[in-house]
Structure formats: structure tokens, C-alpha cells
Amino acid sequence: MTTLLVLTNLPDRANADRLADSLVERRLAACVNILAPCRSAYRWKGAVQHDEEHPMLIKTTAERYSALEAAIRAMHPY
């Protein structure tokens, strides 16, 4: 069994909690760590933007990665 650590960022704690609960409940993740908010810089519509995000570390297996990715894409707000 190959273990993976997946990183994603959510815009707020409520979305992070909702996604974490869903992934663990559906057994797509063994554990999810919601980290302290951080400040992200990125380019959007031709300008550099800055926003606060909540990083998430998601522990899963290679066998469950495809289903995990699909769940994140379905629930992620951006």
C-alpha cells in the first residue's frame, strides 16, 4: 500500500471543516489536518491578488487517490 499526502487550500474554516468531514466519513482520507490560515499570493485576471486560505494536508492511499480527487473537485469552491 502506497501512502500519499495531498495538499489543498480552502478559503475559510467552514469549507475546510466540511470537506475534511466528508473525506474522512467516506473513507477517502485516513486523516485530514487543517492548518493555521496563511496568506497566499496568486495571479488572477492579470493582477496579483492576496487572500487568506486554510491549507489542508490529506492522508490517503494511491488506490483511493482518484476518488479523493473527484470528491475535492466536486466540493471545492474554486
What are these regions (language model features)?
Residues 1-78:
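Positively charged, small/polar-rich N-terminal and surface patches that mediate targeting and assembly
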